[in-house]
Swiss-Prot record:
Residues reported in the UniProt entry to bind ATP: 52, 91, 508, 545
Source species: Synechococcus sp. (strain CC9902)
Enzyme Commission no: 6.3.5.3
Sequence positions that bind substrate: 94-97, 116, 240, 312-314, 548
Family: Belongs to the FGAMS family.
This protein's name: Phosphoribosylformylglycinamidine synthase subunit PurL
């Protein structure tokens, strides 16, 4: 018989983030009232963070299959086939709410958690990336959040020995008090078989390995599924504390154990801890799990069943092991200084049964926790919200005339979202493992050499690599979620193409406000539609990801400040020859600068524009209008040509035009290289602001090698559908000279551009 407990139901439901209707459904499924431990289990497993109760119907529309997809959504991480026997596991997840109240540990444990998702599949982590959002840095609170988050990411990644090779950082008032911390990890499969999480074999022992269990991280999943308020600092106990050195040992021990063949299923203990790992293993396997809490290694005395089940102590794993092989396996982990204990067994009956002090502390059907969970039904607006329809009436004619183009360019280079992120990147070890080909700031995507271990532990020599990037134009998404989400996928694919990589698949992190408002759910639904359409167009299936809702801060007056909807796209691709990878900087004076994509003087082309642009924000202090239309066919033609030109050795550099438009993209190429340029743009009837700073248009700036111009022209002849515009040449002098119109020129020293670009963040953080 399950032990009972007396408690205040209303208070308990509020604490667990459950509704009265949830209580009724829980009682119906159990055939009785739940005790306090069981209610806690339902609270975490029925939270948005764990069961996607608001977003699951929308996610079902994503394309998830393809010739390269080995593992799609539903496992700890997606896995793609890179060819030549290489398999890549990758995933992105958020740690937003914990980072808001405890930025260092919140960000650090976000890194630890995503690494566990990777090596739980049997993959050795080879790289980390992150996507970060903060409020303006003129607020000391936002400065403190940024400093803590970056330090936490650096601490965990550097100590565990995995390079942080790329990412993006952006700033907007909507993120004040609610930063976004999305961590992505990549891993190279080292096991013959991919390790799955579904329980196998009735009677097989369930083995706990890793760190001890304490009271840290209590209720973290429920905490992550509610909005932030002035009282959120009181939720610091819901933030976990990580130990990267212990995780390093856990990585090595797990990979050894998986290679032995003794482990038949594995699940890391992340959100909802033991509750989630037990219920998911049972539900996926169609079996049950019995868990004896008296056997769980504990770091604190007197812990209740509720505390054991909801603890989110870090660096812990749960295995199902072949019967009779548990002792050799546990010895392996103890050699690495890790805890290891048999804590239960696989049951034929599909339940999660929890024992504590010789009594049944909880007994719940596994599918009720991890599979057959509630789905919230929201009505979808039949048309865009009124405020967005009003925004879409804005035209570029309402912008003031551009009086000083050079000052505008310098102002945009001083924008923290555009400016150099060296202050961030220099805190990360980007070269540990010695496989980083290009990393943050040097190219549009990170590239990592593929050097898998042989059976004897030696490294296989290869010139192949994998490229990765994270992207999201959050201003565009705020104004048009569907177009903005399409643009996120398109930009990610463009960034990979700019290093010569063929895009393969994505992982997504959907950071959104509350879905309980009509506008909030519409934003989420439209963004999902945009991602789906774009992924189908680029043939980049979704392998999994994360949904983080209720990203909004309650002001002192009780109103809510929602973030910009921010669907971050993590994309991976294969690089056939890392010796041909291109960076964004010019390489040689005399090389010809060419723009691919929509021509600079395309005045009425709705594929480029200033609505939602960095220039609009810089000029007006706000954003309005409707972002440019995404042309998938043009994107694919441009990207295919760039990849072909890189493979054939025709171009020396490639850089996509995104934040700040064409002038900023060109300036960034000079900043990265130190070389000047002599460029001329045809104006036509366009305004100078649109000519220089319009965004969109599937644009990529390349520098064609001077000695390859004939071959370049031959390639263009065979690709007549790709629009190209010769802009000028790379110069040996150190000046950025950009002429447009009659007598209009931006003429600045590259040194000045570099100084403004480099000082923007340090000056604000000083």
């Amino acid at each position: 018989m399950v032990s009972s407990s007396s408690y205040d139901v209303s208070a308990a439901l509020k604490q667990e983030g459950l509704k009265s209707s949830d209580w009724d459904e829980i009682c119906r499924r159990l055939g009785r009232e739940p005790n306090r431990a069981e209610l806690g289990m339902f609270g975490v497993m029925w939270s948005e963070h764990c069961c996607y109760r608001n977003s699951r119907p929308l996610l079902s529309g994503f394309p998830t299959e393809g010739p390269r997809i080995l593992v799609g959504p539903g496992e700890n991480a997606g896995v793609v086939d890179l060819g030549d026997g290489h398999r890549l596991a990758f995933k992105i997840e958020s740690h937003n709410h914990p980072s808001a109240v405890e930025p260092f540990q919140g960000a650090a444990t976000g890194v630890g958690g995503i690494l566990r998702d990777i090596f739980t599949m049997g993959a050795r982590p080879i790289a980390l990336l992150n996507a970060l959002r903060f409020g303006p840095l003129d607020d000391s609170a936002n400065v403190g959040l940024m400093e803590g988050v970056v330090a936490g990411i650096a601490h965990y990644g550097n100590c565990v020995g995995v390079p942080t090779v790329g990412g993006e950082v952006a700033f907007d008032p909507s993120y004040s008090g609610n930063p976004l911390v999305n961590a992505m990890a990549l891993g190279l499969m080292e096991t013959k078989d991919i390790v799955k999480s579904g329980a196998i074999g009735v009677g097989n022992p369930v083995v706990y390995v890793g760190s001890t269990t304490g009271r840290d991280g209590m209720g973290g999943a429920s905490f992550a599924s509610a909005e932030l308020s002035a009282d959120s600092l009181d939720d610091r106990p819901a933030v976990q504390v990580g130990d990267p050195f212990l995780e390093k040992g856990l990585i090595e021990a797990c990979l050894e154990a998986f290679d032995s063949g003794d482990v038949v299923a594995a699940q890391d203990m992340g959100a909802a801890g033991l509750t989630c790992s037990c219920s998911e293993m049972a539900a996926k396997g169609g079996l049950g799990v019995e868990l004896d809490l008296d056997r769980v290694p504990a770091r604190e005395s007197g812990m209740t069943a509720y505390e054991f089940l909801l603890s989110e102590s870090q660096e812990r794993m749960l295995f199902v092991v072949k019967a009779g092989r548990e002792e050799p396996l546990m010895k392996r982990f103890r050699r690495w200084g890790l805890q290891a204990a048999v804590v239960g067994q696989v049951l034929e009956e599909p339940i999660v049964r929890v024992l504590h002090h010789g009594e049944v502390a909880a007994e719940v059907p596994a599918t009720a926790l991890a599979d057959d969970t509630p789905i919230e039904k929201h009505a979808l607006l039949s048309e865009p919200p009124v405020d967005l329809q009003e925004h879409w009436q804005w035209t570029e004619a309402q912008l003031p005339d551009l009086a000083d183009p050079a000052a505008a360019l310098l102002g945009l280079l001083d924008d923290p979202t555009i400016a150099s992120k060296r202050w961030v990147h220099r805190q990360y070890d980007q070269q540990v493992l010695a496989n980083t080909v290009v990393s943050s700031g040097a190219a549009d995507a990170a590239v990592i050499r593929l050097r898998p271990q042989q059976g004897d532990g030696s490294l296989k020599t290869t010139t192949r690599g994998v490229a990765a990037t994270v992207d999201c134009p959050n201003r565009w998404v705020a104004l048009d979620p569907e177009r903005g989400a399409m643009a996120a996928v398109a930009e990610a694919a463009r960034n990979l193409s700019c290093v010569g990589s063929e895009p393969l698949a994505i992982t997504d992190n959907l950071n959104f406000p509350s879905p309980e408002t009509p506008k909030g759910f519409w934003q989420l639904a439209m963004a999902c539609r945009g991602i789906s359409e774009a992924c189908k167009a680029f043939q980049t299936p979704v392998t999994g990801g994360n949904v983080s809702l209720y990203n909004e801060t309650r002001r002192d007056d009780g109103s809510l400040q929602p973030i910009h909807p921010t669907p971050v796209i993590g994309m991976v691709g294969v690089v056939d020859d890392i010796t041909k990878v291109t960076g964004l900087g010019w390489c040689q004076p005399g090389d010809v600068v060419v723009l691919l994509g929509v021509k600079p003087d395309a005045d009425q082309d709705d594929r480029v524009g200033l609505a939602g642009s960095s220039y609009q924000q810089f000029t007006l202090g706000t954003i309005t209008g409707r972002p440019p239309r995404i042309d998938f066919d043009l994107e694919k033609r441009v990207q295919g040509l760039v990849r072909q030109a890189i493979a054939d050795g025709l171009i020396a550099s490639a850089h996509d035009s995104s934040d700040g438009g064409l002038a900023v993209a060109l300036a960034e190429c000079s900043i990265a290289s130190g070389f000047g340029v002599e460029l001329t743009l045809s104006v036509g009837t366009m305004s100078p602001a649109r000519l220089l700073f319009a965004e969109g248009g599937a644009r990529v700036v390349v520098s064609v090698k001077a000695d390859q111009l004939t071959r370049w022209q031959t390639m263009l002849t065979s690709n007549p559908d790709v629009s190209t515009t010769v802009l000028g040449t790379v110069a040996s002098h150190g000046r950025f000279q950009l002429s447009f119109g009659v007598g209009s020129t931006i003429d600045l020293s590259v040194d000045q551009l570099q100084q403004v670009y480099a000082d923007a963040l340090p000056r604000r953080l000083a």
